[in-house]
Each structure stands twice: as structure tokens, then as C-alpha cells.
Curated annotation (Swiss-Prot):
Assigned protein family: Belongs to the YajQ family.
Role description: Nucleotide-binding protein.
InterPro entries per the UniProt record, alphabetical: DUF520, UPF0234_N, YajQ-like_sf
Native organism taxonomy: Bacteria, Pseudomonadati, Pseudomonadota, Betaproteobacteria, Burkholderiales
Residues forming coiled coils: none
Record carries keyword Protein biosynthesis: no
Keywords: Nucleotide-binding
Cited Pfam families: DUF520
SUPFAM superfamilies membership: YajQ-like
Protein name: Nucleotide-binding protein Bxeno_A3642
Domain of life: Bacteria
């Protein structure tokens, strides 16, 4: 029986490239001259450092523009609160969402069941497995999910025939 998985994960290689490009632009921009503005990446979180709130906003704008150019959906980012660190400097931790949350997976299963398409949806950890008799049914489920779930970027992978 054909099946596929619905997941929510960013392309970490492109995220890393966007961060490196952001740091390169920040180091060469005139308005950041002499400041300690930078972006760091550790596993599933990004930390933005700057001298004040205004420059932190500019650092985030640079990061978001570089991510958009590299086709990384910015809906993967979950912003933490702005923290003050030594002196006048500030930082903000930005978490990268990974996996389909419990509420979203229940919503996906409910949408699939309410659609009356002859497929089954089951929650498997941080992914939702959709299984059906025909490939056409699976393609119509993908189209329906892309239309109805707009708050989180979904990826469809692990296709089996």
C-alpha cells in the first residue's frame, strides 16, 4: 500500500549557509562597524547578539533576508525573549522547530478523516504517516494539507509504493 510521512523540519544545511552569509554581511556593513553584532548556530537554535535592541532588530532582518534567499521558510523559527548580557549588549535565542507537534498532528489526522478520502492517518512520534490504496488519493491528501495547514511549513517525504 502506498504511504508517505508528513514532517516539519528545516534544511539545516541551508540554515547554516544563511547564518554564515548573515555574519559576513554584518561584518562588512558600515552601521555595524565597531559593534559586537553576530549570529551563532548550535544544533537546533540560533543566537543573535547585538549592542542594543535596534541593532538586534537589524541583525534579525539580515538573517531573515538571507534565509528567504536560500528558500528556508521563516515559519520554522520560534523567537525567544530578548535578554540583556554584560554591559549594554543584548541577545535573543531563536529555536528552530523540528517535528510535528502533538496538536498539529491531531489536527492533520482530523483533517484527513474529515476529508472522506479513503486513506488512514496515524501519528508516529514527530511525524504523521498517511497510508492509502491509491497514489491519487495520497496526492489529493497532500494538496488538501497544503491548502488547509498554513501556520506551519509541512514537508512530505518517505514515499513508499
Amino acid at each position: 500500500m502506498p504511504s508517505f510521512d508528513v514532517v516539519c523540519e528545516a534544511n539545516m544545511i541551508e540554515v547554516k549557509n544563511a547564518i554564515e552569509q548573515s555574519n559576513k554581511e554584518i561584518s562588512t556593513r558600515f552601521d555595524f562597524k565597531g559593534s559586537d553584532a553576530r549570529v551563532e548556530h548550535k544544533e537546533n537554535e540560533i543566537t543573535a547578539y547585538a549592542d542594543d535592541d535596534f541593532k538586534l532588530g537589524q541583525v534579525k532582518d539580515v538573517l531573515l533576508s538571507k534565509m528567504a534567499k536560500r528558500n528556508v521558510d521563516v515559519r520554522f523559527l520560534d523567537y525567544g525573549k530578548i535578554e540583556k548580557i554584560g554591559g549594554d549588549k543584548v541577545k535573543q535565542v531563536i529555536k528552530i522547530k523540528k517535528g510535528v507537534s502533538g496538536d498539529l498532528s491531531k489536527k492533520i489526522v482530523r483533517l484527513v478523516k474529515d476529508s472522506k478520502i479513503k486513506v488512514q492517518a496515524s501519528i508516529q512520534g514527530d511525524a504523521v504517516r498517511i497510508t492509502g490504496g491509491k497514489r491519487d488519493d495520497l496526492q489529493s491528501v497532500i494538496a488538501m494539507l497544503r491548502k488547509d495547514v498554513t501556520d506551519t511549513p509541512l514537508d512530505f517525504n518517505n514515499f513508499r509504493d
